[in-house]
A protein has these predicted regions:
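C-terminal helical subdomain
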Residues: 184, 188-191, 196, 204-254
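Active-site helix of classical SDR
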Residues: 125, 162
């Protein structure tokens, strides 16, 4: 690993917008280092001088699973091995579509969605744990979950399955880490219904195309969506505390 000093370092997927972007900005404002991953660029780069070089952006498509080990290696090479007090991995990126009955979804669509929303977080976590096991720093993985991981919905089979998988994966890894010399903390955090691009995608579907489109529109029109910034603030509190991974942590929990 590198020689750059710093207190806390966070690897965050999906920092180009939504919760990932807000979380990165709040952590940077606290003086932390952030390594953002997204398929495209990031607005954070435009204000990189404001962050005193503490934001690094990596453009990468998480659907490309075979390169994730090297991705984590490249990022960890920039993080100090001795000076870092905390290293975190926030698996935030996810793909909502396809929003159709499963018999109307192609193999390519199913594969891409599951790769980004489930397989990538698993591989990122595996590589992160393996490559930081020699460190004494506190380590934590946060997996962004969803109510869809617990409640089945028509035309959302792929997304619901990916989030259910994230929840179970989190609990399994927590059990694996129990009793380790420097265990990695891991939690699944359900942010609730948030005003993000995923919500906009769901609202943009016709009722014929997506049966729940009306419900998503109603939630938006009645002002029930939470802002990404509010969710990011609450998530930072969960990052700081030592949490129980035996259940999904909901944003409404005190």
């Amino acid at each position: 690993m590198g020689t750059e000093t710093g207190r806390r370092h966070f690897i965050i997927t999906g920092t180009s917008k939504g919760i990932g972007l807000q979380l990165a900005e709040l952590l940077l404002a606290k003086g932390d280092y952030v390594y953002g991953i997204s398929r495209g660029g990031s607005d954070l780069l435009e204000s990189s001088e404001e962050w005193s070089g503490r934001y690094r952006h990596v453009q990468y498509d998480l659907a490309e699973l075979n390169g994730i080990d090297d991705l984590i290696t490249r990022i960890l090479d920039q993080i100090p091995s001795q000076e870092a007090e905390f290293i975190g991995l926030i698996n935030n990126a996810a793909m909502l579509e396809p929003l159709r009955p499963i018999d109307q979804c192609s193999a390519a669509e199913i594969s891409q969605s599951l790769n980004i929303s489930l397989a990538a977080p698993m591989i990122l976590s595996s590589s992160f744990i393996q490559q930081t096991n020699h460190l004494s720093a506190r380590r934590k993985i946060v997996n962004l979950s969803s109510g869809s991981g617990s409640y089945p919905a028509p035309s959302m089979a792929v997304y619901c399955t990916s989030k259910a998988g994230v929840n179970m994966f989190t609990q399994c890894v927590s059990l694996e880490q129990t009793g380790q010399q420097n265990p990695v903390e891991i939690i699944a955090f359900d942010p609730g219904m948030v005003d993000t691009e995923l919500q906009a995608v769901a609202r943009g579907k016709s009722a014929e195309e997506f049966a729940l489109a009306g419900m998503f529109n109603q939630v938006y029109e009645t002002g029930q969506l939470r802002s990404p910034q509010d969710v990011a603030k609450q998530l930072i509190v969960r990052i700081d505390e030592h949490s129980d991974a035996s259940h999904v942590i909901h944003s409404t929990e005190s």
